[in-house]
Amino acid sequence: MRVIDFYDRHPISEQHVLDAVRRARSVGPLAAEDLFAFDQDHYGGLAAVDVLARRAGITASSRVLDICAGLGGPARFLASRRRCRVVGVELNAGRAAGMARLTRLVRLEDRVAVVRGDAVTLPFATGLFDACVSQEALLHIADKAAVLAEARRVLAPGGRLAFTDWIAHASLGDGERRRLNAWMAAVTVQTLHGYRALLGRAGFKAVEAEDLSDEWRPIIRERLRMYRGMRAELTVRFGERGYRDYDQLYAFFVALVEDGKLGGGRFSGSA
């Protein structure tokens, strides 16, 4: 499966966020905080974004790049809470447009921008940003070395990269890797030590690599329960068969995490 197709059919969509917000708030203008319970399409919610912000050294004066920004939930959170300026780069046209619309909805377009582009050829000048962040996205990119080299290029001297991603443990088999690629465009799943080496080769210093697998296990269980609670909504969008296929495949994904074959990692380094 192509990554664009995977996110076109992802349960958490712009419309899902808007519907959830309308159920929670019936009147009045919206602020960024009104979206936070619904627009954080990553593991660990706002706390996870806060940790990345600390690892990346983000302050109010920071120029931040969110690589593979999706619907822009973390970018809006950073701009709202840290008062920094954030640019999100996103390959999927629908999600890039959704990020722009949601950002305008909460009147943060003066601090958050989105550019449609490819993470392996970032459309930005060298040294433009003070910090780069990304969350659970690089598994979709075959040439991880190119992404990390581009992140290093667009960072100013002393700037920092911090990101999370899925990692493979030794017991993850070739057949399971192929199924992950076919279902969710996980073209390559790197190991913890593999990422550490790639960061070093890209020129990053003071590299840190943390295994989050135990922390993510209960989160991924809850995500499966959440998707199953969205059955009516997802059946309308994708049909009964489409819903059943997604449920079966997500259950397979959760089983890999439960069995210790797949996990999460957090990485950081200085330019």
Enumerate the language-model features and the residues they cover.
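Class I SAM-dependent methyltransferase SAM/SAH-binding core
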Residues: R63-I67, L71-T121
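A short glycine-rich, Lys/Arg-flanked "PGG" loop and its adjoining helix->strand segment in the class I
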Residues: A145-R160
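Conserved Class I S-adenosyl-L-methionine
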Residues: E208-A271
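Short alpha-helix
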Residues: V187-G203, A209
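Conserved alpha-helix/loop element of class I SAM-dependent methyltransferases that forms part
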Residues: V27, H42-A60
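Short, glycine-/aromatic-enriched active-site segment of Class I SAM-dependent methyltransferases
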Residues: W166-A186
